[in-house]
């Protein structure tokens, strides 16, 4: 796969630096750290702050959802790799106004380990921290193990809900409660057509034939639930929607928000 790229080791810093230069009114790198990105006006007085983060390679997540009505800060790891606990602590300190910080991120082992470590140390330093972990990917675990599922595109709704509640100056407990309710009612499912190439690896992260697709593959190339021959757009949409609907206890009259 051909790329416009300089040194792969500089990829993440050049990426975040470019976005900051393009949007200087929205972002800043905290103390010059291009892995610790916060909204330009952080901390916002009296408001619960939303902290997020994860590996690079998923734009616009995570940095793209830092801003008014969304997250207040994000820590950025290498491509498909978790940011460090130290970066998470620096984000937490930079955005906390005294009203507390909600950690909001997808369920991946490395992210959970480092965010949990950052939360404990931040609490020891006098910052209130609560956590909501997004777990919307129905392909990664059965319904009875919803809280073990991976967090993927459904985090968009969590950002919007948490950000809106925080902007209304709700308490940390209330922001957490409403955001958790949104996460509990979010489902997603994806389909993969081809691999990506991680800059530092230099080769595709999985193999799939040109005439195949894989339903439910994870965003890092984790095995999905079914590999089949390519289908039409209508057939793919029907397949995904049926699986999502069957995973939720819908009743007549329910209203849903849809993200494609």
Task: Mark where each language-model region is.
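Glycine-rich oxoanion-binding loops at beta->alpha junctions
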Residues: 58, 67-98, 245
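Internal, active-site/partner-interface "lid" segment
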Residues: 140-149, 159-220
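Short glycine-rich or small-residue beta-strand-to-loop segments that form or flank ligand, phosphate
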Residues: 2, 48-55, 71-74, 100-109, ...
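Short, acidic/small-residue loops that bind anionic groups at enzyme active sites
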Residues: 74-79, 123-148
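Flexible, glycine/charged-enriched surface loops at secondary-structure junctions
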Residues: 23-34, 169-178, 188-198, 246-257
């Amino acid at each position: 796969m051909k790329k416009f790229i300089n040194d792969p080791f500089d990829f993440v810093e050049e990426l975040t630096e470019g976005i900051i230069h393009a949007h200087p009114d929205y972002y800043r790198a905290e103390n010059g750290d291009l892995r610790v990105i916060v909204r330009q006006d952080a901390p916002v007085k009296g408001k619960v702050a939303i902290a997020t983060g994860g590996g690079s390679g998923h734009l616009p997540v995570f940095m793209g959802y830092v801003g008014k009505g969304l997250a207040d800060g994000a820590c950025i790891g290498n491509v498909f790799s978790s940011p460090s606990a130290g970066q998470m602590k620096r984000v937490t300190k930079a955005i906390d106004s005294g009203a507390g910080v909600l950690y909001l991120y997808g369920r991946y082992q490395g992210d959970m380990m480092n965010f949990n470590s950052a939360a404990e140390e931040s609490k020891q330093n006098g910052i209130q921290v609560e956590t909501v972990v997004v777990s919307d990917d129905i392909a990664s675990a059965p319904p009875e193990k919803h809280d073990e599922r991976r967090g993927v595109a459904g985090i968009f709704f969590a950002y919007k809900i948490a950000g809106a509640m925080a902007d209304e100056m709700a308490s940390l407990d209330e922001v957490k409660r409403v955001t958790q309710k949104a996460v509990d009612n979010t489902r997603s499912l994806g389909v993969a057509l081809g691999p990506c190439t991680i800059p530092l690896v230099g080769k595709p992260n999985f193999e799939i034939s040109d005439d195949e697709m894989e339903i439910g593959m994870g965003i890092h190339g984790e095995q999905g639930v079914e590999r089949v021959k390519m289908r039409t757009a209508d057939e793919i949409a029907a397949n995904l929607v049926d699986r999502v609907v069957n995973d939720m206890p819908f009743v007549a009259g329910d209203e849903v928000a849809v993200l494609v």
